Amino acid sequence: MTFMQANKKRTGWIGTLLLLIFHTGMAQSPTNTPLAPMSLTAKEAVDYALANQATVRNAKLDELIQLAKNKEVSGMALPQLSGAGSFQHNPIVQKQLIDASNFSDTVPKGTLVPFAFGLKFNVLGEVKFSQVLFDPSVLVALQARKTLEELSHRGVQKAEIDVKVNVYKSYYNVLSARKALTILRGNLTTLEKLLGETRETYKNGLVEKLDVDRLVVQLTNLRTEEIKLQNLSEVGLAALKYSMGMPMKQELTLTDTLSLAEIKSAVAVEKFDYSQRIEYQLLESQKKAYEYDLKRYKYNALPILSLFGTGGVSRASDVFNYFDNQTWYGYVGYGVNLSFNIFTGFQRKRKVDQAFLQVKKTEVSIEDAKLGIDLEQTQSTSNLRNNIVALEAQESNMQLAQEVYNTTQIKYKEGVGSSVEMSNAENDLLTAQNNYFTALYNASVSRIDYLKAYGKL
């Protein structure tokens, strides 16, 4: 592929990305048009966020800025052409004293006379040309373009991964709260029915008022818990919309479900390389950028060679008659410039030292990142395994608590069970349900952390 073909391809890609960002921004502009309801899976919510979330959009704009800077650097190696023009009016022309005896033997030495070395009206038009033949700083800047593009692109990838983590966790948080709310409302329906039956039984004198009061207290507690879960669900949904870059007024339905089977679907990673982690990739790219800095300071000892050329026309007179057909005087000049540093007070050496140490510092950061990744993988693997075990246990425990509650309810209706047993069974069921949903959310979050730790998100 030629340079021109690559440039056209890149320009087309930039235009497409700009159009996408512009379209996204327009789509989010405030409008009076009602927003159509949306139904999204967790994956679709992530895709929406990658197109609309402000952090990702800014990262993409930063990438475009870097591409524009790279084109600016490319322009430094191209010919530079500039033009200038001036008009000057001298109502009083500056005079200088000269010895008139230099121009005539008849004039006594030391005879000073004023003499004007200019005219009242002066016009100048000039064009300047320059071309770098060799400049070490320009050479290194051209070589570093690809690395800087890579660095900015990986910044976009890092932003996308962070957004994915936030969206997935927010999505599953809402699902967990809503699932808990659904089961709680089922408990409310059952308890309301039981309270109605108990009141009828109380009217017939078969149970005490204390039994009715206990059920009323339980019902009130459940309704209070329902309000809390409803608020948690609404706030969680608002947080999800924010993490997606979605307007708060947008009606959103979550279509995914939370299940143990889905959480277990996180496939064990058989082979892992640190380059799969975006944080490691960013540090590697940053190291390359610092190495180019080091190279630039080293090359500053080399000379700078460039071509230059100047051409122009001028005219001067004591009368403003530039529209008359009179002679303009042209001039042309060209040459080569060569410059180099002989002694800079050891400044270049100190800059080289600093750049070298910066490279070493990045190498230390890379080694530390490897250790951090190892720790993160160990923790995430252990957390996922333990949370799956806890979820399985809590799921069985909740089912058992439900069976105990159902049996206790039957005994209570048949008059062979007490209200105390009923209250205890209700509390045990609520505790088991809360523990289950906590375990469900923890397992879902640990799955996301596990995938992120292995660069699979």
Placement of each model-derived feature along the sequence:
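Short segments within alpha-helical structural elements
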Residues: 224-246, 399-456
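Sec/SRP-type N-terminal targeting helices
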Residues: 57-61, 74, 133-160, 210, ...
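Small/polar, glycine/serine/threonine/aspartate-rich low-complexity segments that form flexible
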Residues: 29-38, 84-128, 257-264, 308-340
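Periplasmic alpha-helical coiled-coil/stalk elements that build and connect Gram-negative outer-membrane
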Residues: 5, 40, 68, 160-274, ...
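Acidic, low-complexity, intrinsically disordered peripheral segments
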Residues: 3-10, 28-35, 46, 82, ...
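Outer-membrane beta-barrel architecture
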Residues: 71, 128, 293-296, 337-339
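Bacterial N-terminal signal peptides
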Residues: 14-24
